[in-house]
Amino acid sequence: MKTLPEDFRTYTQALMGEKLYQRLEHAILEEEAPTSIRINPFKCKDADGEPIPWCPETGRYLSTRPGFTFDPLLHAGLYYVQEASSMFVDMAIRQYVKEPVMMLDLCAAPGGKSTAVRAALPEGSLLFSNEPMRTRSQILAENVQKFGHPDMIVTNNYPRDYKKSKLQFDVILTDVPCSGEGMFRKDEGAIGEWSTQNVNNCWQLQREIVSDIWNCLKPGGILIYSTCTFNAHEDEENVEWICEELGAEVMALEGVEDAWNITRNLTGTDFPVYRFIPGVSRGEGLFMAILKKEGEWEAGSPAKENRKDKKKKDKKVAKGKGPEIPDGWLKADTEWMPAESNETVYAIPGRWKDIYDQAEKNLKVLHAGVKLGTDKGKGLIPDQALALSTMLNKDHFPQVELSYDDAIRYLRKEAVNLPADTPKGYVLVTYRQVPIGWEKNIGNRANNLYPQEWKIKSSHVTGELFIVNS
């Protein structure tokens, strides 16, 4: 049975008041968390379920929790399983970002907020998704590749590395590491890890993170500060510190309805903040504040701001002088520039090539644009990320539609037999007409090219699911 730390109970009850705290404690100890998903609008038309009021275009509450692992469309990136409170960032982006920007999600793993942000940003924006921890950065890269949008760059760096890079952003999301009080309901381990010392360590680390990244935010730019914890040390007190020490103004969101039961400032100060409390609002614990940096923001396309001499760019991609993008692999409505790193070939949207070059020079880039494949000297082997990209020209490749059972076998990286008349070479395999990966047909058998590290490890199967409409 769950028990909450006494120091947590005493402090949080004093902060929230008896009535609010009792609702929180009952939810943590007795209630099930609601199940919710967010659809990928670049791949998916709609989904069953009840719209989430602060993210109505893409967020859905589900009445039950299905076995998501066994839905091939989850692995194809048509939707993402995300708790509802975290989708509040969608409302912040849509309200404060009205034209193309360059944005950084600084602490982005596993990728839920990054993909939510990318869906909400205006077309023509570029999003950097960063994760400082190496193992978590791999999960971030996987989820970004499944999402499939080309205007994203994934990095594995600390804030100080970004400071040195000289890259400048219009918007920065800092979903900072925290004491995790908002996760107590769904993760009992978070309860065991909690301590007052950890809270103290966290609020100090959070200030260091924001301070390190502050110079990367343009004058007049927007900083979205969020945690998944309740205490004021990591929440209101840090927001107040950012305003006083770094020079920022806290901004309010319009249209936040009383019926959503979002709790406001608990410290008696008058600046607007947004706190989701389990048992009160319909989601897990989240705190968010929107801050504007002092100064005048200059509007303009981030691509134009970072463009260099076009002749230099053309010279870089001359035929026979580096990697090339195979004809027909990508949709032709975008200008693509090739890039290569450790035998991996990428297609970078031309408007971002100079920014990509700056990032590649100064940061550890894990993914950018469209990851086409690896070149081992015998031609390009198409990558899983290409199969899942929204820029894939799928009609260029031979395709085989898989049954549900075969799709699950494929995602387990088991052998899947192809029809006898399937052409030799690389074959795009689909499920419900949605690409899920590649096989290499060599005649008497086919090699499953699904990434080993992505495969479904469970042998259990729940049966075919119909959660979203492709």
Model regions and ranges:
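Polybasic, low-complexity RNA-engagement segments
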Residues: 1-45, 63, 294-470
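Class I SAM-dependent transferase core
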Residues: 56-95, 140, 451
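Helix-to-beta-strand junctions that scaffold the AdoMet/dcAdoMet cofactor pocket
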Residues: 122, 217-219
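S-adenosyl-L-methionine
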Residues: 130-167, 174
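Mobile active-site "lid"/loop adjacent to the S-adenosyl-L-methionine
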Residues: 135, 170-212, 228-236
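Class I S-adenosyl-L-methionine
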Residues: 169, 222-225, 230-354
